[in-house]
Amino acid sequence: MCRSINSRPGPQPPEPLGGNAMKQYVITISRQFGSMGRSIAQALAQQLNIDFYDRDIVEETARRMGLPVSVISDTEENAKSVYFRRIYPLGMGVPNLRDEIFLVQKNIIRDLAAKSSCIVVGRCGGSILADMPNRLGVYVYAPYSQRLQNCTQKLGMDEATARRMIREVDRARELYHRRYCPEVKDVFTDHDLMLDSSRFGVEGSARLLAHIAQTLFET
């Protein structure tokens, strides 16, 4: 379920999934590029009837910082931003502004998690919300061949573009986490569950995670 951040209501009691009330909770999802982690998060949000945040965080960051959405989207996990190469051709100021973007997003993520049950995709959400008592951290991955197939068949990329995107986006996310979550030494840290999406598909993965959330967070 995805609405504008500013149009969403304040704290609401979590919707019951299987007839029993649920505590307020948050699910953080990290993923390999092409593993369909974002699609799984969307399907999971629909099954649990809770909010899903990904692109919304970018838009809210742009609003708070007074920058174009395209700038935030291009730079939040990309050290080779076209915008920053143009504004800071010698690299001066880039780290500080990228750090500011991260700090703004960190505050947004914490605000959203405090407001109501939700799913947060990427952006070191697992590390940022590691102190939350009712948090489920999920890492979605898949074999390279399956990710390549997802990119070409489901995301409409040609094979050369898919291979390049898998390589570059995975690397960018690794560098992003290394900079802003230095305490996270490997993909197991801050994740309670590693999910191979090739085994279950998008809907099957979402159903599995919904069942786990119900088991963990029912009152």
Residue ranges and their predicted role:
Residues 1-21:
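Short, Lys/Arg-enriched N-terminal segments with co-localized hydrophobic residues
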Residues 29-42:
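Glycine-rich phosphate-binding P-loop
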Residues 52-62:
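Short beta-strand-centered segment that lines the nucleotide-binding/catalytic pocket of NTP-utilizing
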Residues 23-27:
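Pre-Walker A (Motif I) flank of P-loop NTPase domains
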Residues 133-152, 159, 166:
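Conserved phosphate-donor/acceptor-positioning beta-strand/loop module used by diverse small-molecule
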Residues 80-87, 158-203:
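Small-molecule kinase domains that catalyze NTP-dependent phosphoryl transfer to phosphate-bearing small molecules
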Residues 42-48:
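A conserved segment at the C-terminal end of the G1
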